[in-house]
């Protein structure tokens, strides 16, 4: 059976589809599993041994559709369910099943704080999309595979971090999903251990300010600013070596879960009720439940729409770390 999975973006969402890839490949007889995604997310899936072929969306959806038509798929699993994936399914003209994104229920929660969302993780809902094919959840969690060239040797890290460290994935796609700088510093001080800051080029400036802050103090927190220095897969390699991961609601959180790292997940304007907490790994949720304005979006904003950003500014770091 030749099956196409579609999920065009983004990092975390694609990682959350990996159990579907695995169970289809291992539970269907003679399964040939293909995946369609955007070219910029190539590194997430390129080493996945359960995939037979990956198809990339560049600028032209028509080119991708023509490429997919030539494959003559038996079944399409749409885990994105938007206008472009509808165009793909319609053009291919084969049996398909799409995930229900529960957008109306999310809208009710965001706009009226009425919560009819199921107490169910998005991964389990993804797997239900494939139920007609006879597959079952194998309870193995998420997958993330790194090529040998992207494995970061431990001696690339400072000596202070080679015998154990905590990772902090400090980035996020939207500002309202990230702690402000002063709260990041407060968090790092509370952690009080050798700490690797992970993120992209957008986090470099704040990460350097955090490093300088602790460099000028006598503190147990020793900062290595890795932001902007490593590729996504290299950052994943660092996560895999960590003892504990702190993360905003972002892609690296799900990659950490794939490696079965313990995660402390930090939530601002979004909420765990959306069904995207760390999957099948030990985790703790840090969120401000004392305010009535969250969630204010199912995704995020460039700034707090009310101007006070209480979800992060008043967040309590009520956790304890043990040796």
Task: Specify the residue positions occupied by each region the protein language model found.
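Catalytic machinery of carbohydrate-active enzymes
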Residues: 1-323
